[in-house]
Structures are given as C-alpha cells and as structure tokens.
Amino acid sequence: MFMSSDANACEIDIKPRSRVVTHGIEATTSRGMLRAVGMGDADWEKPQIGIASSWNNITPCNLSLDRLAQGAREGVHAAGGYPLQFCTISVSDGISMGHEGMHFSLVSREVITDSVETVLMAEALDGVVLLAGCDKSLPGMLMAAARLDVSAVFLYAGSIAPGYVTLKCGESKEVTIIDSFEAVGAYKAGLIDQDDLGRIERAICPGEGACGGMYTANTMASVAEALGMSLLGSASPPSADRRRDVYAHKSGEAVVELLKRGITARDILTKEAFENAIAVVMALGGSTNAVLHLLAIAHEAHVPLTIDDFNKIGNRVPHIADLKPFGRYVMNDVDRVGGIPVVINALMREGFIHGDVITVSGRTMAEEISDINPGLPDGKVIHSFSSPLHPTGGIKVLKGTLAPDGAVAKTAGFDTVVFQGPAMVFDRERAAMDALSAGNIKKGSVIVIRYEGPKGGPGMREMLAITAAIKGSGLGKDVLLLTDGRFSGGTTGLCIGHIAPEAVDLGPIAFVQDGDIIRVDIEKSGIDVLVDEKQLRARHLTPPPPRYTSGVLSKYSKLVKSASLGAIT
C-alpha cells in the first residue's frame, strides 16, 4: 500500500487489480507463469503496468513504437512498477484507401479498444501506457483508457518528415502522402505523366512516422495533449527524434505516479477536458474525424458530449494554424515553433481553455503550461488571435433537411460560404470514381455518395481517393461532395461528411435523386435538399443489399450507432 502525503486521505492501493495474481495460495500458478517472464519475489508488491502498443512493420506510422515501448518499460521500472508489454492491431489508412480494405479502418478503432480492455481485464493489470501511431489506433487507445478507468498515459509515435521531389519541369517542392493521391487524379486527367507520378511516389514517405500534416493522426495526438492524457509537448516531435525516447521514459514513470496518487483516466477526462480538446482542434483546423473520435472517447468516459458542442466552441475559437492539408506547414514545423503547448497557451490566454483540469502529470494544465513556458505563436505556422486565418474554428457541424441529425464540414478549406447546385447521386464510392474517370462530373454539381455510413458501408469509409482525384482533375473548387461516409484528415476541397441519419437508416440522403437542388450555407450551418419533405419521402426506394453477411463487418453493422453519436458500438 502507498500512504498518501495528505494526512486526511485514505491509503491508496497501488495494486488495485494485480494483487489477485500475485498474492495468496490461489495465485501460485499465476506467480509461476510470471516468474517465467522475469518476475521474482522482489516484484510481487509492485504495480503491474501494461505497455500496450500497436507496433507493426506494415506501415511507417508504427515503426518507432517498439523503441518507445522499451523506453516506457524502463520508466515504469525506474518508478517502482513492473511493465508487461503486449501488442494490438493497427490498420494503415494509406494502404487500405480506395479499396475494400477501407471498410475495416474505423472498425479497427473498436477492435483496438476491445483488445486492450480484454488484456487488461484478463491479466489484472493495474495501469497502462498506451502507444499508437496510425489514425484509428490513437482514439482506440484513448477509448480503452476511458472505458477501463485505470491510471493511463498515452504516447504518440510521432510524425514523418516531409519528402522533397523535383519534377521534370524543374519544380522542387515539399510533399506528403496526400500529394500522391492528388497526383493520381492529375495523372488520370493528363496533367502530369507517369515519370512525375513515380517521382512523387518515391518521395512521399522518406522514413518512419505518421502522415505529417494536420491529418487525423496528428490531430488526435494533439487532442491527447489537450485532454491531459499525454505529457505536454509530446505530440509534435518527429518520430525519429530522440526526445521521443525521453517522453517514453517519462510516460512510464508518470503512470506509476498516477497510481500512487489514485488518479485514473476518468479523473482527467472531464467535460472541461473535452472542451479543451475541441478548442485545440478548432484552432489547428484539425481533421473532421476528431468529431467522431471525441464523441466516442466521451461516451466511454461517461461524459455528456454532443455533436452540438463542436459548434458552440468552434463559433468562438478562431482557426490560427496554417497547416496542411489546406495550409503550408506540417507537424515538424509546429514542433519547431514550440509544439502544441504554444497553441494551448495562446488559447488559455484568450480564455478558451480550462486551466484547472488535471493532467497525467498529476498537475493542472495551467501549472504545466506555466512550467513549460512555451512562448507565443510565431505568426507564420501558428498565427496570433489578432490575425487568425479564419475568425471561427476549422470544423463546422451543419444541420438541415438533408441532415437532420448533423453533418460535418472542414470549413478551414471552404472558400465558398454558400454552394447550391444539382445533385449527382451515386450509391457507393466506386460509382462516383467511375463517373469522374469517364469525365461525367459536371462543374457546379453536388456529388452525393451514399450507403457509405457506419452501418450501410459498413465501416464509414474515408473518401480520400475520390476527393483527391477531384482535386487532381482540376474540379476541386467547382463541385461539392456530400456523403454519409467520412473523409481523411488529408482531404481537401468542398467536402461534407458524416451525414446523419445515413442512407441505410432511411435518412433524407437515401431519397435524393439526380437533379435535386442541394444548398449548403456554411455561415448559417445549414444543409438542405430543396424538395418538399412529403414529395421526398413518397419516392420509391430500393436500397442495395447488405455487403457483408458474415465476419467482423457483419457484426459491426448490427452494433454500430449513428455518426452523430461517434459511430460507437
């Protein structure tokens, strides 16, 4: 037992779970098993800490995690705990994009959460350091911490350095993975040749780390800092940077200290912490996937967060970070000018951050920021609030007759406040890609892709392949794309996703026909189909049959809830 320094406090058991496998006659067999992996008589009083990693060598996003897990283990040992490492899955969105594999991406978030819960409960671990690098593994780990309500610290793998390419014309430029998707569209439109396409392919991923812009992985790493679930400053250093090893060691130490103080994940994951995270996402112009993931993490933490909270905060918080996919800079540049603490500090100075929330350091956000003293925005990568990129946040929730339960737009990329045009309707993404390849997409159209929602997809695929192809073909500012699916954090152009209710649930999007006029008003948060509701509902509807009748996607389609609730299961 650990006696709190507070004389009025109760004793805190730093082995709240693992005592059942280390103490007493009944634990003879489990102790024998644990001796075989290195534990001994001197270790039975130590808390057992899981080191949960989504390491694999399928994708560069996760390559650093084995190294970081070693640092976390050393930190746990140094603080008086005993680390026990295990792995879970991770799906690469970059590899699974544009084909059947993308159905499994969002599903992997739930599998990760369930698998971490399974191991921690089965092995009676007391706390956990959570390590992740690819898009869905970050929220999956945070959801697990919230569900289990154990002492937990999250550490990000870090992002990749940008690549550099010189094209045949002599132009040299910085590139990220998103440039390759757009280059495919440009090649199909005859705007570049295969030689330049190959040059871009070879340049986009120069080493280890997650995709470098303010795409989903970097957005969720920033969210983890803002929630207080990661050590401040740990989101922005590049994957190969040895500061990450220091953060890994400190994360291992921190989780043991949280146990000693009796602080668990839900002590940190309060409503105020989620409001801080939303403010940071809005200021960064982060990925629309953050809406889904924050709703899901809040659900696991039993925090009453709703989709409407995003507009309440986004309408007050300006967009100040000039980051890709719409801006000029990447996460390495954020690190160069002081990291996410600079953004949190700026928000706190303007009254947009709750400074009294607790963090994994055991101290408040305000105390941590004061100690780090991160400085002010540089004015280029991160603007001041006196000269923001946009006066409101980078994400907007829209509602109207097309999406009564909501839709999500990344307004950081919208040059057009109002867009109105005739619908071109496609059941699923492939049909839209075929129409684009055939040159059948017309300027001024509203492309509607449906039956791609959480249940109808199933899996709510990201539409990066089609949006990048639209931009690459030169139509990026001339058409609007709407879907009950979702978009990659790297998506650019006029795109609105997460339309709810989805088509398979007989939402209005299911009844839209070619030629129906659709109007989107970003300023008024409106999204409407200009057809009388009775007329719309009277239309004959023949939904496509279920895509999967067995396996994980069949199970998922029966359990998953609306995107407006975070696509939770």
From Swiss-Prot:
Pfam families: ILV_EDD_C (PF24877), ILVD_EDD_N (PF00920). It catalyses: (2R)-2,3-dihydroxy-3-methylbutanoate = 3-methyl-2-oxobutanoate + H2O; (2R,3R)-2,3-dihydroxy-3-methylpentanoate = (S)-3-methyl-2-oxopentanoate + H2O. Its cofactor is [2Fe-2S] cluster; Mg(2+). InterPro entries: DHAD_IlvD/Edd, Dihydro-acid_dehy_C, DihydroxyA_deHydtase, DiOHA_6PGluconate_deHydtase_CS, ILV_EDD_C, ILV_EDD_N, IlvD/EDD_N. GO terms for biological process: isoleucine biosynthetic process; L-valine biosynthetic process. Binds 1 [2Fe-2S] cluster per subunit. This cluster acts as a Lewis acid cofactor. The active site is at S488 (proton acceptor). Its EC number is 4.2.1.9. GO terms for molecular function: 2 iron, 2 sulfur cluster binding; dihydroxy-acid dehydratase activity; magnesium ion binding. Pathway: Amino-acid biosynthesis; L-isoleucine biosynthesis; L-isoleucine from 2-oxobutanoate: step 3/4; Amino-acid biosynthesis; L-valine biosynthesis; L-valine from pyruvate: step 3/4. Mg(2+) binds at D93, D135, K136, E462. Functions in the biosynthesis of branched-chain amino acids. Catalyzes the dehydration of (2R,3R)-2,3-dihydroxy-3-methylpentanoate (2,3-dihydroxy-3-methylvalerate) into 2-oxo-3-methylpentanoate (2-oxo-3-methylvalerate) and of (2R)-2,3-dihydroxy-3-methylbutanoate (2,3-dihydroxyisovalerate) into 2-oxo-3-methylbutanoate (2-oxoisovalerate), the penultimate precursor to L-isoleucine and L-valine, respectively. Belongs to the IlvD/Edd family. Homodimer. This is Dihydroxy-acid dehydratase. The lineage of its organism: Bacteria, Bacillati, Actinomycetota, Actinomycetes, Micrococcales.
